[in-house]
Amino acid sequence: MNPDLSRLRPYPFERLARLLEDASPPDLEAINLAIGEPRHAAPEHVAARLAAHLGGLSRYPTTRGEPALRAALAAWASRRYGLVPELDPERHVLPLNGSREGLFAFAQCVIDRSARPLVLMPNPFYQIYEGAALLAGAEPWYVNPADPETPAPDFEAVPESVWKRCRLLYLCTPGNPTGTVFEPPLLQRLIERAHEYDFVIASDECYSEIYPDEARPPPGLLQAAAAMGLDDYRRCMVF
């Protein structure tokens, strides 16, 4: 048995469910802000296409995903973030069953538990970041906001001694639950530190397409790296 299992804390959604068991607002309809899932039905044209292809679901998919899917993902991300040259679907893209499995497995791949590693993450954070760090034998290090009125994590307050032990930095942009968007100058400073202190950035961008202004989509880590001329995206992983 992995002894690090004892370090895990209860999953927040389980705790939240227990807290809400007896909560019943008298004259108000409750708004569930717990798990981020759609509150409306799937679009009919999407459901129809899925149903039309159910006959092909009797076999396991390829490990790397279908070539057509990887090509479509690479083309979309290249358009979305203005990446030149475009992403290579053979080198840069791997489909996952949601971001959680990748965010967890990535930590197990890049962390050497013998080196007293730290995994940095914004606070508040998605629980999987902490769990992945603990089960990889690392210590989580929480990057707090500068003050309660400013939800952005204060990376300038991170001591150099912490950066030196950092092996993985989790980001979430746009952030959950704060909504914080990391702008390119900050992302580029973090990329520079990743190269200086020999760690990797895992940017959780699952909310990248939820934003109020169609003219200003949130920037991303790959976009920031490309603007620096780092078109190999070394030390940058996006989920």
Q: What label would you give each PLM region?
A:
Residues 168, 200, 237:
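Short, Asp-centered acidic motifs that coordinate Mg2+ and/or phosphate
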Residues 205:
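Walker B catalytic acidic pair
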Residues 49, 189-196:
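Catalytic-core regions built around general acid/base machinery
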Residues 117, 196-199, 233-234:
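A short helix->loop->beta-strand "cap" motif at the edges of active sites that frequently abuts
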Residues 2-101, 105:
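N-terminal small-domain helix-loop-helix segment of the aminotransferase-like
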